[in-house]
């Protein structure tokens, strides 16, 4: 099948690799190169790099206006696959090809529609999730489902683990669909259980020690690497990169450091910190961190 691919980050890479192997990718659309690092050198997106390596024509428009729509109409393709592209796709593009536009969404739709389904799945402590392949419409992740696979999450699944699982599973489902697309009956999404996975903000990363240790641990795993779950100490922002929660009763004020190994009393339970990063410094395990930053027992963190 002849395919136009629209995507940008690492999450979209497994699907493009599968499409290159099993189908004919006629064109790739991705975000423009962005300045990165201290030298602010322009860096191509992971999808741009992969397409370039396979000599596939790459386009990096700043908008999806008429000139881009006309270009897409001229590309000889049967279907468009859109994965974390970074632009809202207009109706003219959704309807440009015979089989429309397909999208991989890493959640149990209609739960976690929106920009940050992976992060919200972890933050909210979900123990089950899904990967859905849908035919896109003009709504926000409201399209009909062509294929879905459910799976269980381990209690302390990390964002990286969930990201990789969904990216690879989505790529496999996509190839199955394209092999049998004329025989698949789309299923409308339920109107029940709709939630929205809004984009994360830096402010959301601030830890509220009145919450349970379990909920804070979910936040730490769901917000690593960005924006990071953090607290302030001596006017410095400190991110917690890894921790574990203990279901232990205590009588301390929430936020109290109750041991010299940085165990912190929460609204319920205790958070045992394992890895941290102070702003503008490298990540350290707890032993290394405490050698340079002495957070005393009985300190109450804010």
Curated annotation (Swiss-Prot):
GO terms for cellular component: cytosol. One of its GO terms (molecular function) is methionyl-tRNA formyltransferase activity. Transmembrane segments: none annotated. Keywords: Protein biosynthesis, Transferase. (6S)-5,6,7,8-tetrahydrofolate binds at residues 107-110. SUPFAM superfamilies: FMT C-terminal domain-like (SSF50486), Formyltransferase (SSF53328). Its EC number is 2.1.2.9. It catalyses: L-methionyl-tRNA(fMet) + (6R)-10-formyltetrahydrofolate = N-formyl-L-methionyl-tRNA(fMet) + (6S)-5,6,7,8-tetrahydrofolate + H(+). Pfam families: Formyl_trans_C (PF02911), Formyl_trans_N (PF00551). Gene3D superfamilies: 3.40.50.12230. InterPro entries: Fmt, Formyl_trans_C, Formyl_transf_N, Formyl_transf_N_sf, Formyl_transferase-like_C_sf, Met-tRNA-FMT_C, Met-tRNA-FMT_N. Belongs to the Fmt family. Attaches a formyl group to the free amino group of methionyl-tRNA(fMet). The formyl group appears to play a dual role in the initiator identity of N-formylmethionyl-tRNA by promoting its recognition by IF2 and preventing the misappropriation of this tRNA by the elongation apparatus. This is Methionyl-tRNA formyltransferase. It comes from Rickettsia massiliae (strain Mtu5). The gene is fmt.
